[in-house]
C-alpha cells in the first residue's frame, strides 16, 4: 500500500513490520520562497518570486505556491513570469540565509539518523532502516522529521521506500507537506503507471527515444528487452530497467564517513563516436559544466585540469595542465580542456569517451558567494557576470534537473549521448 497524508493520519496497517531498507527523501517545499515568506510575514499567502529582474532578462529560481497558481514555474524567464503574475512580489534571493536554514534542516536529519546524503540545498536522502541505527518504525521517524522541519517555519515533502529511486519519486507525488509511503512489496504498483520522466535521470532525449519504441511508462520500461533499451542506454540498460521496476539497491553513507576528495571529474560514453571538432568541444564543455557545479556544491576549486579521451579502437589518452590559480569556473577550466584537445586528438579520429577532471584543490580567488544573484570577491568588488550566472544555474539544475537550463553548445548533440551520467555505472561522475 502507498499513501500520502498532509495530517499524517495514516492507516494502522502501514505500521506493520517493515522488511528491508527504509530510504527517505526530504524535499523542502518552494524552499527559497518559503524562507522569504518566513522572513517577511506580510508576504505570506501572496505570490512571491525569487529570481532575476524582469527588466534585465532574468530567470525565475523558484516561486511560492501562490505564484504557481498563475502558471509561474522555475527556470521561466522573469519577463514571462511578470506577465503571468503582475502582482507578484519579487526578490533577488539571499543565498546565505537559505544556506543557514538548510543547515538547520540538515541538522534535524543528522539528529534522527547518521546516514544522510545531502543532494542539494533543499533535498537530502536519509536511511532509517530498522536495526541499522535504531528499531523505531520508519514511518514514525519520517513523521517526526516532517514535524520538526515545520517547527522551523518551512515545510517539506517526504517520500519513503526501499531505495532512492522510489523515495525520490514518492516525495514529488503530494507537494506541499506530503508524506508518501511506498511500503515494501508495493513498488511495482506505485511505479508502473507513471510516465518515464518521473524517474530522475531520464531527460527529454531519452524520453523521445523511448517513445519511438513504444515505451511511455515506467511499467513498460521495467519490462522492455535489451534489444530496445541497449541502443538508448548502452551498458546501463539493465540498471535503468531495475530502477524502473523498483529493484535498485541504494546506499546512504554515514555523515561522518571519510570524504577526502582529491579530484572531481565526469566522463561520458557516446552512443555514436564523435569526429567533428565542434561536437567534441561541445561535449567537453558539457562535461565541464557538470564538474563546475559539483565543485561549487562542495566548496572546492582546483589548479589542475585533466582531459581524457578514449578512441573507438580502444586506446585512451590523458593530458593535464596546471593553472596559475585554483578555479571552480567551467568557463575557465573548460576552455583549458578544449585547448588541450589538439595535443591528444587529430580531427577525424573517432572518440568513444571523453572526460574532464579538476584536482589539486586550493583557495578560489573569487571568494565565496554571498547572494544568489550577486557574488562578491575577497576585495568586495562584484565578481564576474559569468560566475554569478553559474551559481544561479546551479540552483536551478539542482532543484529541477540538468534539462532545466542548457546552452546551445550543450544541446547540439545531446540526443547522441548515452543519457545523463546518473545512469552511467562504468563511466559515472566521480569525486575521488
PLM-predicted stretches and their roles:
Residues 1-242, 255, 293, 377-432:
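Gly/Gly-Pro- and Ser/Thr-rich, intrinsically disordered tail segments characteristic of DNA damage-repair
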Residues 10-17, 198, 206-351, 363, ...:
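DNA-contacting surface of Y-family translesion DNA polymerases
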Residues 31, 54-57, 312-316, 361-364:
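Short, charged/polar surface micro-motifs in flexible loops or helix N-caps
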Residues 61, 168-170, 252, 318-319, ...:
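Short, well-ordered secondary-structure micro-motifs
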Residues 119-123, 161-164, 300-304, 349-353:
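Short Gly/Ser/Thr- and Asp/Glu-enriched loop/turn motifs at secondary-structure junctions
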Residues 124-130, 317-321, 363, 371-377:
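Short, hydrophobic beta-strand segments
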Residues 327-399:
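C-terminal hydrophobic structural anchor segments
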Amino acid at each position: 500500500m502507498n499513501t500520502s497524508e498532509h495530517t499524517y493520519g495514516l492507516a494502522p496497517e502501514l505500521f506493520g513490520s517493515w522488511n528491508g531498507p527504509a530510504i527517505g527523501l526530504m524535499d523542502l517545499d518552494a524552499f527559497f520562497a518559503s524562507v522569504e515568506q518566513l522572513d517577511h510575514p506580510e508576504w505570506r499567502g501572496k505570490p512571491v518570486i525569487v529570481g532575476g529582474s524582469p527588466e534585465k532578462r532574468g530567470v525565475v529560481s523558484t516561486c511560492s505556491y501562490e505564484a504557481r497558481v498563475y502558471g509561474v514555474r522555475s527556470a521561466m524567464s522573469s519577463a514571462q513570469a511578470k506577465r503571468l503574475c503582475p502582482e507578484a512580489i519579487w526578490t533577488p534571493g539571499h543565498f546565505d540565509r537559505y544556506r543557514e536554514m538548510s543547515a538547520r534542516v540538515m541538522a534535524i536529519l543528522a539528529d534522527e539518523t547518521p546516514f544522510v546524503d545531502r543532494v542539494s540545498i533543499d533535498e537530502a536522502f536519509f536511511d532509517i532502516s530498522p536495526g541499522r541505527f535504531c528499531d523505531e518504525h520508519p514511518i514514525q521517524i519520517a513523521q517526526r522529521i516532517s514535524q520538526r522541519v515545520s517547527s522551523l517555519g518551512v515545510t517539506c515533502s517526504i517520500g519513503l521506500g526501499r531505495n532512492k529511486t522510489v523515495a525520490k519519486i514518492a516525495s514529488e507525488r503530494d507537494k506541499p507537506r506530503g508524506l508518501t509511503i511506498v511500503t515494501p512489496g508495493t513498488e511495482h504498483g506505485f511505479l508502473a503507471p507513471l510516465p518515464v520522466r518521473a524517474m530522475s535521470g531520464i531527460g527529454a532525449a531519452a524520453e523521445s527515444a523511448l517513445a519511438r519504441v513504444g515505451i511511455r511508462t515506467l511499467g513498460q520500461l521495467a519490462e522492455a528487452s535489451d534489444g530496445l533499451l541497449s541502443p538508448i542506454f548502452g551498458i546501463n540498460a539493465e540498471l535503468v530497467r531495475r530502477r524502473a521496476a523498483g529493484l535498485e539497491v541504494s546506499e546512504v553513507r554515514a555523515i561522518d564517513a571519510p570524504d577526502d576528495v582529491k579530484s572531481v571529474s565526469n566522463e561520458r560514453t557516446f552512443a555514436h563516436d564523435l569526429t567533428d571538432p565542434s561536437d567534441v568541444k561541445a561535449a567537453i564543455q558539457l562535461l565541464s559544466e557538470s564538474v563546475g557545479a559539483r565543485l561549487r556544491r562542495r566548496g572546492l576549486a582546483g589548479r589542475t585540469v585533466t582531459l581524457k579521451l578514449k578512441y573507438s579502437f580502444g586506446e585512451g589518452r590523458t593530458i593535464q595542465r596546471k593553472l596559475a590559480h585554483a578555479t571552480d569556473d567551467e568557463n575557465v577550466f573548460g576552455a583549458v580542456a578544449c585547448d588541450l584537445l589538439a595535443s591528444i586528438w587529430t580531427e577525424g579520429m573517432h572518440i568513444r569517451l571523453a572526460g574532464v577532471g579538476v584536482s589539486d584543490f586550493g583557495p578560489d580567488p573569487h571568494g565565496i558567494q554571498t547572494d544568489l544573484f550577486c557574488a562578491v570577491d575577497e576585495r568586495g568588488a562584484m565578481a564576474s557576470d559569468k560566475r554569478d550566472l553559474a551559481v544561479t544555474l546551479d540552483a536551478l539544475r539542482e532543484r529541477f534537473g540538468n534539462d532545466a537550463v542548457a546552452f546551445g553548445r550543450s544541446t547540439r548533440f545531446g540526443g547522441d549521448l548515452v543519457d545523463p551520467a546518473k545512469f552511467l555505472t562504468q563511466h559515472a561522475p566521480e569525486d575521488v
